[in-house]
């Protein structure tokens, strides 16, 4: 207990002057998590999205047709648009130019008050000022009313006055912003071309007719990609379905307005068993859904049940189709525009507007009902697939119940092949999923028995991308993983029952090992995605090379490290180099030292950003689906990112 003197001192110190107000830019620089989420690569790229979103607002308002994003060799990035250009006059309320207001005041911009943007993704109006606050340098050039203006900023402050630097044709307008992220703030300041490509492609699909050019000047020759979708979200659905066979050629499309909400929906079924329905509000993805998704699902369930009853596809006594049955294999984009979107939190994860639910349900019900009446063949295909899904779901439920009864998840009913750890606190425990018997044997001998469990996977793992849930219970390896993890799957999933803090996939460093990695990741992503979202899934990184000289041993995890070691020790006839093809080539001591020892090993955590859901779904369907051509294109496009190729 504090003494009376200590209490009096604390009370005296905690006066009005103890309350500190952080002003711009300190409030952003010290509390950046409130504005961009994190200081890692995700937060870094968020800066680009903020500026691009401002340009997209111009496009949504009908004033911008082209956005150019350029990554420069010095690490800076430029976003240029041909919109109206930021106003350059004096704002009478503040006495500052409108440009300086936009870049140095939070919640300033054309999305507030009248005469600005009707629909805007940047709800909070903090984009440009936050980018300024978190940039080592920022330059803005504006073309407006036949004049060219320029101003510079650094870490939130203007470093020059807004100056007229020249003239331009009166019809030539726009804003060009170049900024260099602040290395004092960010863990990395290197922009990822692939990350930006995914986001900008998505933006182009959502903004019909908008052209977006992405250029990377860091490569030789420079890399450039142009995104332009006259078909809008219809083309988006076609793009997302390219890894699967579609069940009918048309992309079903609905468009309308109700209660001030603009609704646009496109959907198409494919031959997979996965639902991929993505929601967007004013071009901002809502990973956790919200009222617009609720309205869509309600409409879809009602429409198809009504159609199936009216056309005797479902008999009077048949069970109604569940929404998940109708959405099996469905790819859908639900894109709405709302004047005042109500998001849950700054990161806009979930929409809360009740009018959005009613608007989407109303528009989809009206338009889709008419389409089905005019296209009975398509309607029958969807209903038939839904009925098959319903039957499979019932079979899966029975198999799941049977599995539960046979293996109540306790220590006495764990898989026989599992070498479990003795510590029962999940926070301390990890499980290695090991390919093959020989490697499994070495791993069991190498492990720390207290905290490391080993599950050898002997048979072939089912490719769940091509199988409904009822079939996975027939696969021994997948059943063993489900039982060992303890969480259950799909609707039964419960993260609190997870038996291990780390699930580590440990396979050979060759093509077969990579294939098994992908099979296991596909299973976890499709049936237990929360394990990935919460950071519990890892890939072990066994060494590729063993380098030996004069009885000293070095391990190299890639070609670059091997070369570095050889440069240090000198390459002569006393050097022995072994290329590991499999985990079984290492004895238990080597396996522990290189791959399993928490003090020395390298693990790669598998993470998925909610904003990348569409691209992740597409990647799994391309890699694990039946269509060869999209897989070939994917490999060709991504081959340059591969560090080690085993042929």
Give short role names for the model-derived ranges:
Residues 24-25:
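Alpha-helix capping/hinge segments and adjacent helical runs
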Residues 89-94, 292, 323, 470:
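Conserved, non-catalytic sequence blocks in retroelement Pol enzymes and Pol-derived host proteins
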Residues 57-58, 85-86, 511-512:
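Residues immediately C-terminal
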Residues 30-49:
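Conserved short strand/loop->alpha-helix "switch" segment adjacent to the catalytic nucleotide/phosphoryl-transfer site
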Residues 391-410, 425-430, 441, 445-447, ...:
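C-terminal interaction appendages of subunits in large macromolecular complexes
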Residues 29, 86-109:
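Short conserved segment of the HATPase_c
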Residues 1-18, 49, 57-59, 64-76, ...:
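GHKL-family ATPase ATP-binding module
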């Amino acid at each position: 207990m504090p003494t009376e003197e200590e209490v009096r001192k604390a009370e005296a110190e905690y006066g009005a002057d103890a309350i500190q107000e952080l002003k711009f830019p300190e409030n952003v620089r010290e509390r950046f998590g409130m504005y961009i989420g994190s200081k890692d690569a995700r937060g870094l790229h968020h800066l680009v999205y903020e500026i691009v979103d401002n340009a997209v607002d111009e496009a949504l308002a009908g004033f911008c047709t082209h956005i150019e994003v350029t990554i420069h060799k010095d690490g800076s990035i430029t976003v240029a648009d041909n919109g109206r250009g930021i106003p350059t006059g004096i704002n009478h309320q503040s006495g500052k130019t409108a440009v300086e207001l936009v870049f140095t005041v939070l919640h300033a911009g054309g999305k507030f008050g009248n005469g600005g943007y009707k629909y805007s993704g940047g709800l909070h109006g903090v984009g440009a000022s936050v980018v300024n606050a978190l940039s080592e340098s920022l330059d803005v050039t504006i073309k407006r009313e036949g004049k060219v203006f320029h101003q510079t900023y650094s870490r939130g402050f203007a470093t020059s006055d807004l100056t007229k630097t020249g003239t331009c044709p009166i019809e030539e307008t726009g804003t060009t912003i170049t900024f260099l992220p602040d290395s004092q703030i960010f863990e990395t300041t290197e922009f990822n071309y692939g990350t930006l490509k995914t986001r900008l492609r998505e933006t182009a699909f959502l903004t019909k007719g908008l052209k977006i050019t992405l250029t990377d000047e860091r490569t030789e020759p420079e890399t450039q990609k142009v995104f332009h979708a006259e078909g809008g979200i219809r083309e988006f659905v076609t793009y997302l379905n390219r890894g699967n066979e579609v069940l009918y050629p048309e992309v079903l499309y609905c468009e309308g307005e109700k209660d001030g909400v603009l609704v646009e929906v496109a959907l198409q079924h494919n031959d997979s068993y996965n639902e991929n329905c993505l929601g967007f509000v004013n071009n901002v993805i809502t990973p956790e859904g919200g009222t617009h998704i609720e309205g869509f699902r309600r409409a879809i369930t009602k429409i198809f049940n009504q159609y199936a009853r009216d056309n005797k596809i479902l008999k009077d006594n048949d069970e109604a189709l569940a929404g998940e049955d109708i959405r099996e294999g469905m790819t859908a984009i639900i894109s709405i525009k709302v004047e005042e979107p109500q998001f849950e939190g700054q990161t806009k994860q979930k929409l809360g507007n009740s009018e959005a639910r009613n608007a989407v349900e109303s528009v989809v019900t009206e338009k889709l009902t008419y389409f089905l009446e005019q296209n009975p063949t398509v309607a029958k295909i969807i209903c038939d697939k839904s009925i098959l899904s319903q039957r499979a779901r019932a079979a899966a439920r029975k198999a799941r119940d049977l599995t539960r009864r046979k293996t109540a998840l306790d220590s006495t009913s764990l898989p026989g092949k599992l070498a479990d750890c003795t510590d029962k606190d999940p926070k301390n425990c990890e499980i290695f999923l090991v390919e093959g018997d020989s490697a499994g044997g070495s791993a069991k001998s190498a492990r720390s028995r207290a905290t490391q469990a080993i599950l050898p996977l002997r048979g072939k793992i089912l490719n769940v991308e091509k199988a409904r849930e009822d079939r996975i219970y027939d696969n021994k390896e997948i059943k063993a993983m489900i039982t060992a993890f303890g969480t259950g799957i799909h609707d039964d999933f419960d993260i609190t029952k997870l038996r291990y803090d780390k699930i580590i996939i440990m396979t050979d460093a060759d093509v077969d090992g990579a294939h098994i990695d992908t099979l296991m990741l596909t299973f976890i992503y499709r049936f237990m995605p929360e394990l990935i979202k919460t950071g519990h899934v890892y890939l072990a990184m066994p060494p590729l090379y063993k380098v030996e000289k004069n009885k000293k041993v070095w391990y190299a995890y890639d070609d670059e490290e091997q070369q570095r070691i050889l440069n240090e020790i000198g390459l002569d006839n006393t050097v022995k180099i072994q290329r590991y093809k499999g985990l079984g080539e290492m004895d238990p001591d080597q396996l522990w030292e290189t791959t399993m020892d928490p003090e020395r090993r390298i693990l790669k955590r598998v993470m998925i950003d909610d904003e990348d859901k569409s691209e992740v779904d597409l990647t799994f369907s391309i890699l694990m689906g039946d269509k060869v051509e999209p897989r070939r294109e994917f490999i060709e496009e991504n081959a340059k990112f591969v560090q080690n190729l085993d042929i």
